[in-house]
Amino acid sequence: MKQSIIQALRKEFETLEMKSGEGVFDYFSRVMSVANKMRVHGKQMRDVTIVEKILRSLSDKFNYIVCSIEESKDSDLLSINELQSSLIVH
């Protein structure tokens, strides 16, 4: 049972994408909600996994910001809060 819940949450996490017109805060809330559910059920979710997922799944209007972040910062060292702050500023 637990494994099937984790599998369902993993699929939900992998298919998450920012919706057209969705704000940064709302998208981060959706991603973190799924990630936290996975953690509750025993799945290890490193921050870098979440940061990379968010960078890959933002809407096209953030492409130039994502490129800038990837060039200037090591995504392994970027916290979720730092990423959110960087995106909100833009």
Q: What does each model-found stretch correspond to?
A:
Residues M1-H90:
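Intrinsically disordered, low-complexity linkers and tails enriched in Lys/Ser/Pro/Gly that lie
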